[in-house]
């Protein structure tokens, strides 16, 4: 084979395995054919390993073929700074023919063999390419049909009308604490993700009706896969930009290539951007840092041992007392200084081994910790007229309003066994176990207007366990038809809640003409945020009353049916209809509109009165996705959803949930232009349109009495803000040299500066003439993020002595 002159080259290598047993496949033919007609071929060895050397950089199709297995096609993007390491999973054919060639599964098909519907694979490549995603898996997932972000300031996602509280993050089989900076206790999102996409391999995202191994969720699951570091040469990545400065290093830990490391860290301070006049959405400067690592060892017995970790910390001070200009538009509450910080971390040990050609075991032990702490000072302010005639705000006095510290430590264990009974039957059994210790302390003023009269709202030290066993079975009826069935169970000791059997089923039929139909359903259950069980509203410090400690699981039944067709040139269309019934939703005992179904997407905790599991909810909708995967330097994605999301509180009234925007549509497109052999210019555009947020009428008297925004209960979610619209644009330039790849990018979020309304906020006027005027309301509209330019410079390079 000849090398194309002056074009940088790179290595493609990896491992070919059976998709169900994970055992290595010997003799798999791996082939790359480039545009010039030149071909690169390799055969996998006894351990399933293959290597293609000196492949020209660029976008290529990697095709893997093996007798009695489906053909698999993988799109590979090669750069000169990093080797491409792939794991290619092949599915065994049912038909007993000597050799059969079958069109491989579509790009983006999920890694989990048990998933038949409502699932999507996402890659690092996609999180980088989609405008507005900020290299964040959650924000990237908001482009999928049925998914939308809750607001611009956070990465919480709403899946089919469900609260973000129902989203579960998993890594190597164990459940993670909220992997976001500035995360409110019990939530699943935040302003900035701790998860760095450079740390991940291809991963799965599930939207309800998921396989039996996933539990404690009525909404969705991110099943994250951590990639291994390069085990043959040392590679480095550096990046500087709006979201922080980061470094990553990876490489072998011995000369045999049996051990590797991957270490990365990031630190961000946005004060420099604020000083030069770039708006970052707030006058307060958020400070955060995070890191991750993975050490991987290939053991002599054929097993694999990995030590991994992830963590981050963040702090912010929102000091309204420093603001002198008279305006109602404050970030946060306009009558208090707020100091808030969070931290999370997880360290785990994962072991994987093929016991034989048909049986595979994986297990993980991990410890994780999360902390949230805050204190607020109440401000008594007035207006001061200066000698110049200007009016400014002065602080007459301030005093402590509230403070809290929550700590949760979790000891987790996970084990699962895959056994391939035959070509047609696969069974998987396993269990997740969590031991959780809690230390919760919180005090707040009984009456905001009366200093130093505090009540201990949380004062709890204790422990609980969450146990989730499962079993699932896959029946490959033929090469065209699959059926899955499973059962998930769940027990939570704090509330003594038990869901003894949650059945899950899925079915898929692949028809002629590259099209398929699929259907499935399942029962699911979910515990509430831990702090809601230990709230002490009515008791004293000496005799606390945990009035919600016996709160049961919220439950749901979710069903779906869909159709998918693939056309030439990488174009596909997919549509899915779903129906979800939620029951045993926690609502107040006293008749009201309150329901836990509406919470989980704000910077506030919930202070719930006595709750009972009598609420209900209904979500149903129709989704469509038209997509062209990145091929021949172009991609596009259209996703649209029409949906309805309603609930009933304890007052028996059917209302819109807080996430019932009725519709959401996304259109993304991107094009890369090659300039010579080594330069690539990338352009991407994204347009989002969605129904506005629901809200209600303000109870002015109660708001003034409580010093906090209070809505009329009877009119909750009866109004709607105007529709949401946002245009994002991304521009990038990439240069490949012999051993380096340089990339400069600019992500222009909300390019048009559209003023989308986030909600109302409590903003009392300090002017007596205004506050006494007829029709006065102590509120202000709070808008979402304005125009935000996010730039970065990234460099990938390898050590000079590596080839």
Question: Where are these predicted regions, by residue range?
Answer:
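Outer membrane beta-barrel strand-and-loop segments of large Gram-negative receptors
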Residues: 402, 410-412, 457-462, 468, ...
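C-terminal beta-signal and adjacent terminal beta-strands/loops
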Residues: 636, 687-707, 724-726, 733-803
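Periplasm-facing N-terminal accessory domains of Gram-negative outer-membrane beta-barrel systems
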Residues: 4-99, 103
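Transmembrane beta-barrel wall of Gram-negative outer-membrane proteins
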Residues: 241-267, 280-319, 339-367, 421-422, ...
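Flexible loop and strand-edge segments within Gram-negative outer membrane beta-barrel domains
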Residues: 282, 304-354, 369-394, 398-407, ...
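Gram-negative outer-membrane beta-barrel transporters
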Residues: 579-581, 601-691
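Surface-exposed extracellular loop regions of Gram-negative outer-membrane beta-barrel proteins
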Residues: 180, 321-322, 326, 444, ...
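Periplasmic N-terminal accessory/gating domains of Gram-negative outer-membrane beta-barrel systems
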Residues: 70, 77-85, 99-210, 221, ...
């Amino acid at each position: 084979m000849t090398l194309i002159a002056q074009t940088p080259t790179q290595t493609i290598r990896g491992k070919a395995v059976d998709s169900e047993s994970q055992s290595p496949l010997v003799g798999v033919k791996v082939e790359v054919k480039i545009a010039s007609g030149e071909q690169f071929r390799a055969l996998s060895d006894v351990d399933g390993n293959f290597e293609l050397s000196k492949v020209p950089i660029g976008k290529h199709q990697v095709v893997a073929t093996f007798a009695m297995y489906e053909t698999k096609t993988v799109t590979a993007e090669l750069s000169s700074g990093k080797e491409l390491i792939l794991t290619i999973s092949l599915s065994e054919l049912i038909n007993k023919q000597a050799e059969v060639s079958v069109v491989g599964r579509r790009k983006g098909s999920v890694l989990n063999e048990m998933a038949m519907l409502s699932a999507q694979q996402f890659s690092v490549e996609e999180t980088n390419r989609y405008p507005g995603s900020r290299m964040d898996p959650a924000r990237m997932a908001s482009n999928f049909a049925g998914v939308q972000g809750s607001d611009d300031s956070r990465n919480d996602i709403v899946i089919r009308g469900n609260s973000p509280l129902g989203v579960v993050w998993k890594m190597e089989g164990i459940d993670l604490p909220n992997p976001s900076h500035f995360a409110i206790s019990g939530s699943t999102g935040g302003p900035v993700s701790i998860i760095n996409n450079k740390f991940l391999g291809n991963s799965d995202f599930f939207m309800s009706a998921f396989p039996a191994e996933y539990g404690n969720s009525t909404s969705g699951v991110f099943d994250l896969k951590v990639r291994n570091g390069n085990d043959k040469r040392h590679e480095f990545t550096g990046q500087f930009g709006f979201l922080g400065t980061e470094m990553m290093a990876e490489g072998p830990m011995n000369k045999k290539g049996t051990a590797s490391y991957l270490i990365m860290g990031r630190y961000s301070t946005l004060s420099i951007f604020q000083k030069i006049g770039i708006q970052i959405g707030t006058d307060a400067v958020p400070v955060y840092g995070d890191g991750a690592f993975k050490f991987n060892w290939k053991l002599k017995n054929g097993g694999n041992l990995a030590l991994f970790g992830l963590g981050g910390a963040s702090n912010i001070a929102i000091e309204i007392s420093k603001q002198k200009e008279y305006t109602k538009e404050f970030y946060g509450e306009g009558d208090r200084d707020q100091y808030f910080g969070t931290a999370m971390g997880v360290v785990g040990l994962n072991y994987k081994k093929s016991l034989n050609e048909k049986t595979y075991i994986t297990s993980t032990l991990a410890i994780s910790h999360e902390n949230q702490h805050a204190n607020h000072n109440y401000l008594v302010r007035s207006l001061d007229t200066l000698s110049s005639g200007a009016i400014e705000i002065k602080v007459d006095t301030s005093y402590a309003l509230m403070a809290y510290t929550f700590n949760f430590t979790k000891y987790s264990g996970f084990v699962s066994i895959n056994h391939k009974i035959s070509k047609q039957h696969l069974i998987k059994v396993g269990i997740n176990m969590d031991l959780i210790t809690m230390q919760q302390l919180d005090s707040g003023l009984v009456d905001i207007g009366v200093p130093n009269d505090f009540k201990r709202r949380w004062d709890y030290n204790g422990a609980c366990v969450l146990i989730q066993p499962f079993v699932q079975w896959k029946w490959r009826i033929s090469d065209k038809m699959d059926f899955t069935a499973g059962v998930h169970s769940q027990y939570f000791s704090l509330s003594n809640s038990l869901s003894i059997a949650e059945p899950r089923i899925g079915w898929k039929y692949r028809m002629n003409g590259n099209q398929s139909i699929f259907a499935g359903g399942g029962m699911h259950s979910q515990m509430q945020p831990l702090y809601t069980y230990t709230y002490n509203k009515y008791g004293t410090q000496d005799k606390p009353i945990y009035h919600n400690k016996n709160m049961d699981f919220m439950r749901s039944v979710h069903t779906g049916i869909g159709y998918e067709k693939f056309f030439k040139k990488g174009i596909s269309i997919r549509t899915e209809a779903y129906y979800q019934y939620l029951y045993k939703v926690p609502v107040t005992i006293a008749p009201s509109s309150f329901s836990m179904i509406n919470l989980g997407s704000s910077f506030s905790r919930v202070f719930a009165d006595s709750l009972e599991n009598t609420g209900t909810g209904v979500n149903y909708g129709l989704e469509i996705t038209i997509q062209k995967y990145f091929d021949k330097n172009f991609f596009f994605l259209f996703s649209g959803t029409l949906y309805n999301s309603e609930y009933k509180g304890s007052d028996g009234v059917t209302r819109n949930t807080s996430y019932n925007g009725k519709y959401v549509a996304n259109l993304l497109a991107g094009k890369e232009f090659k300039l010579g052999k080594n330069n690539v210019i990338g352009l991407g555009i994204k347009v989002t349109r969605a129904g506005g947020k629901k809200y209600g009428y303000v109870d002015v008297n109660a708001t003034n009495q409580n010093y906090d925004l209070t809505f009329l209960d009877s009119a909750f979610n009866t109004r709607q803000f105007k529709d949401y619209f946002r245009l994002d644009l991304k521009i990038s330039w990439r240069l490949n040299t012999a051993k380096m790849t340089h990339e400069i990018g600019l992500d222009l979020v909300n390019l048009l500066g559209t003023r989308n309304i986030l909600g109302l906020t409590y903003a009392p006027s300090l002017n007596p003439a205004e506050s006494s005027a007829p029709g006065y309301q102590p509120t202000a509209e709070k808008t979402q993020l304005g125009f935000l330019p996010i730039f970065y410079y990234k460099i990938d390079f390898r050590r000079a002595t590596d080839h």
